[in-house]
Swiss-Prot record:
Pfam families: Ald_Xan_dh_C (PF01315), Fer2_2 (PF01799), MoCoBD_1 (PF02738), MoCoBD_2 (PF20256). This is Probable hypoxanthine oxidase XdhD. Keywords: 2Fe-2S, Iron, Iron-sulfur, Metal-binding, Molybdenum, Oxidoreductase, Purine metabolism, Purine salvage. Its EC number is 1.-.-.-. One of its GO terms (molecular function) is oxidoreductase activity. SMART domains: Ald_Xan_dh_C. The lineage of its organism: Bacteria, Pseudomonadati, Pseudomonadota, Gammaproteobacteria, Enterobacterales. Its cofactor is [2Fe-2S] cluster; Mo-molybdopterin. Belongs to the xanthine dehydrogenase family. Mo-molybdopterin binds at Q414, F445, A727.
């Protein structure tokens, strides 16, 4: 069929299949703003276009509908090198993070302002209601529109976007646009899907329909015979190598309990076979031709089921230890299943697979018996959290190709270096033969720390020699991604009558699902990032992680802290009620203070024993709680309106800024011939603005404009090793490596500048904009670089920095919530939510606020509406964004504020600490304690629903 239509003002004539999906059609025409985030359901809005004057989801159209249509995409906004009014406002406000659906947002807002000169909040919410944004938290979009409206009348107009910090510094703590924001909002090619070549093969995966089963028969011959099928991968022809999907530093503190394909299916969605074909359509047709028979086994779906004496064993294969094998290993293995499979454990992590225990650890300080004996009151409560999904706007995706004898991996990953190490081992290549290019990442939130499809894609390319694309559908994100661990946490508190704690005991039990990636470290962070908030002389913790047959779990932003913090905060609040003490008052009496030693962290490691006992070197909780109390009007009356009851709640929170003594970051900076700089950073910017942090740190040290610094990051050929984007490590680790590299280069520039000026080094200094200034005059960086590159020069000037540390940098914060609960219907309305955070010196204030809003809204979603639900046989019923319940713009609190409260930390660069992860840690307990304040009930399992409210009120 030949169709005629207008695309961004240009007439088009195309021969198409009448039923061809318009999103795919436009994307293949180069309209990269029209993306697919939700399997064509039109829920996410990443595919928004203007169709005959109306915003429409392109995925919901077929090609035949384009006949005589007028189509506009985000490519019509601005010019190739000039942002439109709305795009510029988005960049200036700092709303662009992962950027994946920001072109769609720009198009929708532009259309709104073309129709309504000054839209109300309700009109804004309505216009953006069809857009899904997992990272930005929505609040800053109101600022975008405010700024765009102001600039319509006055192009030079500004609004108050974010405060500034550190008057003694030039660029740190000041507004500066995110370095990659412009190309993202303009939809310039920067994601994996934008790099895929036309000749690429496609992978489609046949997945298990059973939660627990053995493959008894597998025949792929008919699929292999289908024209266009290039290869089929199964357990019969994949590498016989065991690994963990978790992208962590080696040796990994997780069981190596996965083979690329196995005989045993351990969850609905587990891998059966991968078809590599010349088109998606052929691959899908080939999947139907694969013959599989299963022996269906009883699934294990919960912690309690996993603990049962007669529980089915999820991992019944033999175990091999690299070091530290237990005395019982030979006897345990004598009862193991002999299928030719095994698992490997690098070092003791308390694993007992025959008991469904993936990992466990125990520790304590002080004398627990004495602590509880000294208590005037003792309480013990159990709290539960359910499974939640990261929902990155861009699903998992990988594109692999050969470059001569080298494997090139274009990946949407948080850990390019760990990815290279893992894949090189699996495909039997040396690391220098594997080139990982981390493209822009359309959202990660921990899920892209795990290696979930890259190894299959790489193996397919190595076997066939063909370029290969493997992209998860949204359904695969729910059944084959790694989600948040289910947890059951019991807290026992002993206290004096005045509320001061004498003993704290936490029993943290986690459900890791079918594989043990992060099974030690995520649950360990439950106590590690909650117990130190309330220092006590007598503390005991037990962590036990169980295998089951729910869909996989792994790294999710917060990394165990939200579950531990929910339990300790709720238990303390219940203690306060029993003692008739105000919740905020009991927090004040027990909370951590600046300079205080955090003794319990001397007993909790993350893959290895701690080398020292850290302290809270910087902590702004005193000021945070003062401001929060005033903002929420903590002690003011709470009016009642019929069935609606008002309540207020609070939670204090903490996080780490990297993993001392385990992780490392490196950086190299080159002085270019004209005096500008190129930074080769190993860090992985996944939308957090890390490249901008590195830019500003280099500019601050080198006294040059940030515009003179360009960052190349996350490319294993063109940067030095970095652990990757996890554990809130970017600013402290990658940032400090950049600072050290800049300082190293600064000394070289000063030395050669002094020589050129004929002065002692002690008499010269760097000065903005990019000169060495002495008593006799000054010389520019460009002149120094040129001198070095001459035939009699000293060579190119390069600075390097390597950062490791034994020290912790802890960001702190508090969340304050005000809710209204309808005691007749159970409805919960979150009216106010204030997130106040101490991230040290905010390097990028407007980006920091965006990180807080995004993380906080994800936490609100986890608390109010999000959960993966299963039937009795282990089939996940939640498989798309429409049914999952992640919040959109209409779900945010009416009064939603993020506040930066600075401190000065000795570990981070220029006093900075992490910001992106801590924001998810406090919403659940803040909301739950507010619900109790409103109607007197304790909800000990989150998320919170009207049914749970009414059940607790004994109305159903």
């Amino acid at each position: 069929m030949i169709i005629h239509f207008t695309l961004n003002g240009a007439p088009q004539e195309l021969t198409v299949n009448p039923g061809e999906n318009v999103q795919k059609l436009l994307f293949n025409m180069g309209m990269h703003s029209v993306r697919n985030s939700d399997d064509g359901f039109g829920f996410a809005g990443s595919d928004a276009i203007i169709f005959n004057g109306n915003i429409v989801n392109a995925s919901l159209l077929i090609a035949a509908q384009l006949e005589k249509a007028d189509i506009r995409t985000a490519e019509s906004l601005g010019k190739w090198n000039e942002l439109s009014l709305v795009q510029q406002a988005m960049v200036d406000v700092g709303v662009v993070q992962s950027g994946y659906n920001d072109p769609a947002a720009a198009l929708i807002i532009t259309d709104l302002l073309d129709r309504i000169a000054a839209p109300t909040r309700e009109e804004i919410d309505d216009a953006l209601s069809g857009l899904f944004s997992r990272d930005a938290g929505w609040q800053q979009y109101y600022q975008v529109i405010e700024l765009a409206v102001a600039r319509k009348n006055n192009p030079q107009a500004t609004i108050d976007i974010a405060p500034t910090f550190r008057d003694d510094l030039e660029v740190i703590g000041k507004h500066y646009p995110k370095t990659d924001a412009a190309k993202m909002v303009q939809a310039k090619p920067c994601y994996v899907e934008d790099r895929v070549t036309a000749d690429a093969c496609v992978i489609k995966m046949l997945r298990s329909p059973h939660a627990h089963a053995l493959i008894t028969h597998l025949d792929v011959s008919k699929a292999e015979a289908l024209p266009g099928v290039v290869h089929v991968i199964t357990h019969l022809n994949c590498p016989d190598i065991y690994y963990t999907p978790g992208g962590q530093s080696a040796p990994e503190p997780s069981p190596l309990d996965r083979r690329m394909f196995g005989k045993k299916m351990r969850h609905v969605g587990d891998r059966v076979a991968a078809v590599v074909a010349e088109s998606e359509e052929i691959a899908l047709e080939a999947l139907k031709l694969i013959e599989v028979e299963y022996e269906v086994l009883k699934p294990v779906m919960s912690i309690d089921e996993a603990m049962a004496e007669d529980a089915p064993v999820v991992h019944d294969e033999p175990v091999v230890y690299v070091a530290g094998a237990p005395d019982t290993l030979e006897d345990d293995n004598s009862h193991a299943a002999q299928r030719g499979e095994h698992m490997i454990i690098n070092f003791p992590i308390g694993s007992r697979p025959r008991k469904n225990i993936a990992a466990s650890i125990h520790g304590h300080i002080g004398d627990m018996d004495k602590g509880f004996a000294d208590a005037d009151v003792i309480i013990e409560r159990t709290y539960n959290s359910t499974q939640a999904q990261q929902c990155p706007t861009e699903t998992h995706i990988c594109f692999t190709r050969m470059d001569g004898d080298r494997l090139v991996i274009h990946a949407s990953t948080q850990v390019p270096w760990h990815l290279r190490r893992q894949v090189a081992r699996l495909v039997d290549m040396k690391q220098h033969k594997v080139h990982v290019i981390k493209e822009r990442v359309g959202g990660g939130f921990g899920s892209k720390q795990d290696i979930l499809l890259e190894e299959v894609c790489a193996w397919a390319t190595c076997v066939t020699g063909r370029p290969v694309l493997f992209r998860y559908t949204r359904e695969e994100e729910f059944i084959a991604n790694t989600s948040r661990h289910v947890a059951k946490v019991t807290v026992k508190l002993g206290a004096k009558k005045d509320g001061r704690l004498t003993a704290v005991k936490m029993d943290f039990r986690a459900n890791t699902g079918p594989y043990g990636n992060h099974s030690l470290t995520v649950p360990c962070n439950g106590p590690a990032l909650s117990l130190p908030l309330y220092p006590c002389d007598n503390v005991d913790f037990q962590v036990t992680t169980y295998y089951s047959n729910i869909c996989p779990n792994g790294a999710y932003q917060g990394y165990g802290a939200p579950k531990g913090n929910f339990a300790i905060t709720m238990a303390l609040a219940e203690l306060a009620e029993q003692l008739q003490i105000d919740q905020l008052e009991i927090i004040e009496r027990n909370r951590v203070h600046e300079g205080q030693e955090l003794k319990i962290l001397g007993a909790i490691g993350e893959g290895k024993a701690p080398t020292s006992v850290p302290s809270a070197a910087s902590c702004a909780l005193e000021e945070i709680l003062r401001q929060g109390r005033e903002m929420i009007q903590w002690s003011s009356p709470k009016p009642q309106n019929g069935d609606w009851h008002i309540g207020r709640g609070v939670a204090i929170i903490m996080q780490k800024s990297g993993i001392p003594d385990i992780d490392q970051a490196n950086c190299m900076i080159k002085l270019e011939s004209d005096g500008t700089f190129i930074v080769h950073s190993g860090g992985a910017d996944i939308g957090t603005g890390l490249d901008t942090v590195v830019t500003k740190l280099a500019a601050e040290v080198l006294h040059c404009p940030p515009q003179d610094v360009h960052v190349i990051s996350g490319d294993t050929d063109h940067a030095l090793f970095d652990k990757g984007a996890y554990a809130s490590s970017g600013t402290c680790f990658s940032g400090n490596a950049a600072r050290l590299a800049a300082e190293n280069l600064r000394e070289k520039i000063l030395f050669h500048g002094a020589q050129m000026l004929g002065e002692p080094v002690a008499d010269v200094q760097l000065a903005t904009p990019g000169v060495v200034r002495g008593k006799k005059g000054e010389v520019s960086f460009g002149d120094i670089a040129h001198k070095g590159e001459t035939g009699t020069g000293f060579g190119s000037l390069v600075g390097t920095g390597s950062y490791i540390t034994p020290d912790f940098a802890f960001p702190y914060g508090a969340n304050f919530a005000e809710v209204a609960v309808n005691t007749r219907t159970g409805e919960i309305r979150l009216d106010k939510f204030y997130a106040l955070l101490d991230c040290g010196t905010p390097v990028n204030p407007e980006l920091a606020l965006g990180q807080i809003y995004g993380a906080t809204l994800r936490a609100i979603g986890h608390s109010m509406s999000e959960e993966i639900i299963y039937d009795a046989e282990g089939h996940p019923l939640t498989r798309d964004l429409r049914s999952y319940g992640a919040p959109k713009i209409g779900d945010i609190p009416r009064d939603f504020r993020a506040v930066l409260v600075p401190s000065d930390d000795k570990v981070g660069p220029f006093g900075a600490k992490s910001i992106s992860e801590i924001g998810v840690n406090g919403a659940a307990p803040a909301i739950a304690t507010a619900i109790h304040d409103a109607c007197g009930i304790w909800l000990r399992e989150w998320h919170f629903t009207p049914e749970k409210i009414l059940t607790a009120l004994e109305k159903i």
